[in-house]
Amino acid sequence: MKKFLSLLLVLVLALSFAACTSQAPADVDEPVAADGSDLEYVVGNGKMVIGYTVYEPMNYTDDNGEFVGFDTEYAKAVCAKLGVEPEFVEINWDTKEVELKAKNIDCVWNGFTITEERKQNIEFTTPYISNKQVVVIKAENKDKYTDTASLSAANLVAEIESAGEGAIKDDENLSKANYVSVAKQTDGLLEVKSGTADAVVLDYTLASAMVGEGTDYADLIIIDGLDLAVEEYGIGFRKGSDLAAKVNEITAELNADGTMDEIAAKYDMSAILVK
């Protein structure tokens, strides 16, 4: 019996030692935990993962293959002051909040319209751009479509979950139209250009940069005088994130030293820059 107990004790000790020694050492390259502070999380990781969709003039690739845009340069300037690298990740706009909550991205920095509904789940910075929704049609239809009443029987498109979609649903006339959502605002322009849609409701910032003479959409125009929802852009972080306040602080510095003015002038956005 004693011999059996001795053998059992040796076996237990051996198993305990094996279990302890088999544990892998901590990986020093693993991301820093962020149970409390997103600011500490981002600084600790040495990067800010920024969610975006292709949206000229905010985030896009130019003819030289360089990733540029107002929001792109703004984000780089903020990250430089934070001492971290910006990492831009293209996302599906419809799942942006899911990506944020899952920490696949640290923020949405992409012409993100501030709304009361979104504020319930998103921590926004103070506004930095004043924008509006406009309607783009083929130039040949400029006399046919002049106001929301004339568009009430048209085939409309807008980016899903966008301010453009909201403007359609909230307008008495536009809500009667034949509406189909698209994945991206640029998809809406393609639909109108190809003739599968009569009009697209989208951000003025994008429309003014991509439509008209000298662009790929030279045959499209913005309906003159038809301004829909007026809105403001903010950078979206996880609800309760301390990064929003820090970015506000840095933005104030960038306004003071003229950086924001320089970026806005470069992308012809000086008139809608909010300080």
Task: Describe each region flagged by the PLM.
Residues 80-81, 89-90, 94-107, 121-123, ...:
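Short helices/loops that flank or line small-molecule/ion binding pockets
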Residues 138-156:
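Flexible hinge/capping segments at coil-to-helix
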Residues 27-111:
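Extracytoplasmic small-molecule ligand-binding "clamshell" domains
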Residues 61-64, 75-84, 163-183, 211-216:
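Ligand-binding cleft/hinge of the Venus flytrap
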Residues 1-45, 272-275:
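Short, low-complexity disordered leader/linker segments with a strong preference
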Residues 134-143, 230-246, 250:
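A bilobed periplasmic-binding-protein/Venus flytrap-type ligand-binding module shared by bacterial periplasmic
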Residues 31-33, 163-180, 218-219, 223-224, ...:
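Ligand-binding clefts/hinges and TM-proximal coupling segments of bilobed small-molecule sensing domains
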Residues 95, 112-120, 167-170, 193-194, ...:
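A ligand-binding cleft/hinge motif common to bilobed small-molecule-binding domains
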